Swiss-Prot record:
This is Histidinol-phosphate aminotransferase. The modification N6-(pyridoxal phosphate)lysine is found at K228. It comes from Methanococcus maripaludis (strain C7 / ATCC BAA-1331). Coiled coil: none annotated. The lineage of its organism: Archaea, Methanobacteriati, Methanobacteriota, Methanomada group, Methanococci. It catalyses: L-histidinol phosphate + 2-oxoglutarate = 3-(imidazol-4-yl)-2-oxopropyl phosphate + L-glutamate. Its EC number is 2.6.1.9. The keyword Transferase applies. GO terms for biological process: L-histidine biosynthetic process. Belongs to the class-II pyridoxal-phosphate-dependent aminotransferase family. Histidinol-phosphate aminotransferase subfamily.
């Protein structure tokens, strides 16, 4: 008997997650100077994290032999002030929002339960739901209607077996938001948990933030992250805002020390450096508009409106997305080929914001490729 006979059948069905490519990988594979590579593929903050974090991390070096606090009161207080939500309604994850997603599946899902996921969207939802035994009911962001959520495709899939519904807004990779009236209708149509993923909410209209819905409804969990505008993708800090009951259940099965000392210190400092946060947010929105307007000039591309720090682009010059992205890679440009996103045809790629210098170089290279 081989190890294959011991592995769960559901795991054998999975394909490994395809992340955005790194500068190191492209430099190694294509022989390009890493300093000349333009990385616009992973929805990161191109200005990095607060410069105050480096000094704070030095203070932690002498303590790395000690376990971190399972719950850091200072971090919880800072998140509470930032979100204007009570501490008791917040749970922090040490693998970004992915940990919160996985833990909520662990407390909700029994074999055969159902989870509704509109696609195309963030692929981790389906991976986590499936591994815990859920059956996926696919809804859709309608490609024929600028990827607006087809709300009926969600409502028609709700049954007594539905345990959770994932709503990413702004949606990854399409960049658009789901109208609040549609989310309200879904939340009030079921007692299943509705997970509102707000990973990119800072880049959206400030009036759209639905984090306080976690207090209005018992069946809402709002996901937030430090990986985007705060520039801490490498530290893996995410959190959820939800009812006290759900927080209590999640704390029973949450990994104890998943948030490292370095991660905690980084997140606290990032929240305290409000000036750097505002700079990154304002320049990020300006960068987004610069790339969007630049790409709109190319007739061979269809660029979709966005309220995130990235935008979805469709190739219309005869190439598929993988061929197009390969051409860009050879020129030192990393964008995200979206072929691996369920529900998308193989003609889409996603572009993240860059610094203004990176944007200028990127748009120049794009003009060489598409014209």
């Amino acid at each position: 008997m081989s190890i294959d006979d011991k592995v769960r059948a559901i795991v054998k069905e999975f394909k490994a997650y395809v992340p955005g490519k790194s500068k190191e990988e492209i430099a190694r594979n294509y022989g390009i100077d890493p300093e000349k590579i333009i990385k616009l593929g992973s929805n990161e903050n191109p200005w990095g994290c607060s410069p105050k974090i480096a000094e704070k991390l030095m203070d932690e070096v002498s303590k790395l032999h000690q376990y971190p606090q399972p719950i850091n009161p200072e971090l919880m207080d800072e998140i509470s002030k930032f979100t204007k939500m009570p501490v008791e309604n917040i749970i922090v994850g040490g693998d970004g929002a992915d940990e919160v997603i996985d833990n909520i599946m662990r407390i909700l899902i029994d074999e055969g339960d159902e989870v509704i996921i509109p696609i195309p969207t963030f692929t981790q939802y389906a991976i986590s739901a499936k591994i815990h035994g859920a059956n996926i009911k696919w809804a859709k962001f309608d490609e024929e209607n600028e990827f607006k959520l087809d709300i009926e495709s969600v409502l028609n899939n709700i049954t007594e077996k539905t345990k959770a519904i994932f709503l990413c807004t702004p949606n990854n990779p399409t960049g658009n938001v789901i109208p609040t009236e549609d989310i309200k209708k879904i939340v009030e149509s079921t007692d299943a948990l509705v997970m509102i993923d707000h990973a990119y909410i800072e880049y959206s209209n400030e009036d759209y933030d639905l984090t306080d819905w976690a207090l209005k409804y018992d069946n809402v969990l709002v996901l937030r992250t430090f990986s985007k505008v705060f520039g801490l993708a490498g530290q893996r800090v995410g959190y959820g805002v939800t009812s006290k009951k759900i927080v209590d259940y999640m704390m029973r099965i949450k990994p104890i020390f998943s948030l490292t000392r370095a991660s905690q210190a980084s997140a606290i400092t990032a929240l305290q450096d409000k000036e750097f946060f505002e700079k990154c947010l304002n320049e990020g929105i300006e960068s987004r508009e610069e790339i969007y307007n630049g790409l709109k000039k190319f007739k061979q591309l269809e660029v979709y409106p966005t309220e995130a720090n990235y935008m979805l682009v469709k190739v219309k010059n005869g190439m598929n997305s993988s061929e197009f992205c390969e051409v860009l890679l050879k020129k030192g440009v990393i964008v995200r080929d979206c072929y691996s996103f369920e529900g998308l045809e193989p003609y889409y790629f996603r572009v993240s914001i860059g610094t203004f210098d990176e944007n200028e170089r990127f748009l120049k290279i794009m003009s060489e490729v598409v014209e």
